[in-house]
Amino acid sequence: MRHRKSGRQLNRNSSHRQAMFRNMASSLVRHEVIKTTVAKAKELRRVVEPLITLAKSDSVANRRLAFARTRDAEVVGKLFNELGPRYQERPGGYTRILKCGLRTGDKAPMAYIELVGRPEAAEAVEADDAE
């Protein structure tokens, strides 16, 4: 019975899931928007949001915890130097999931997961307003 077992299995074993979400979290932090399935996006939110909350208070211990979860020094640097200060006043909800139709081939529901308030998105909106 799966009573009180949270999280999706996604038809993978635990080490595969852990590696997949570690890679997806690194990609999301690096690029600030990625395209994936809706189920993976909803699970990825549970991985990335605590990382950003951790990055809001910069300390050696927090950097080591973030590195243990991502295994990528570049991502840890961006988390603590850019994203932590950017979301200092926001109490949570750092990601947004936008559904974008079905994948060609297997009709899996796809979605973009992005970081809220990313500078590229703000510049695009300002450019549209100027026209």
UniProtKB/Swiss-Prot annotation:
One annotated Gene Ontology cellular component of this protein: cytosolic large ribosomal subunit
Give the domain of life.
Answer: Bacteria
A single MF term (Gene Ontology): structural constituent of ribosome
Asked whether the UniProt record includes Protein biosynthesis among its keywords, one would answer no
Q: Which UniProt keywords apply?
A: Ribonucleoprotein, Ribosomal protein
Which Pfam families does the record cross-reference, listed alphabetically? Ribosomal_L17
Which biological process terms from the Gene Ontology are attached to this UniProt entry?
translation
HAMAP family according to UniProt: Ribosomal_bL17
Q: What family does the entry list?
A: Belongs to the bacterial ribosomal protein bL17 family.
Instruction: Please describe the quaternary structure of this protein.
Output: Part of the 50S ribosomal subunit. Contacts protein L32.
This one is known as Large ribosomal subunit protein bL17
Q: Which organism is it from?
A: Shewanella violacea (strain JCM 10179 / CIP 106290 / LMG 19151 / DSS12)
Q: Its encoding gene is what?
A: rplQ
